[in-house]
Amino acid sequence: MGRRDAQLLAALLVLGLCALAGSEKPSPCQCSRLSPHNRTNCGFPGITSDQCFDNGCCFDSSVTGVPWCFHPLPKQESDQCVMEVSDRRNCGYPGISPEECASRKCCFSNFIFEVPWCFFPKSVEDCHY
């Protein structure tokens, strides 16, 4: 087997594994609430929106100079809670429990330090692909 054949076989193997993995399409809020300058590339030059979404990524070609296929914001319990950490408005106090936060009808996520863990939700009216 020549070098070119090995490269082709490797490319087909990677594509096959990607197809088997099958990712869930992100929600509109996971895509549209991410600032263009914070996008992390998730595709290759010339990728289509369908290919991008099939990989579990977001697609938006309306802004030049930034990736069009990009990784989404992390999934939350509710789309109202999907936002960049810089957009969080505090709804609690240091050490608040998830239960107390929920009783205030707020969102809770304690994965990132030095940002509000209990924060106000946002309307999903502004979310779009």
From Swiss-Prot:
Disulfide bonds join 29-127, 31-58, 42-57, 52-69, 81-107, 91-106, 101-118. It holds the Pfam family Trefoil. Stomach. GO terms for biological process: chemokine-mediated signaling pathway; maintenance of gastrointestinal epithelium; negative regulation of gastric acid secretion. It comes from the Eukaryota. It is found in: Secreted. PROSITE patterns: P_TREFOIL_1, P_TREFOIL_2. This is Trefoil factor 2. It comes from Homo sapiens. The lineage of its organism: Eukaryota, Metazoa, Chordata, Craniata, Vertebrata. The gene is TFF2.
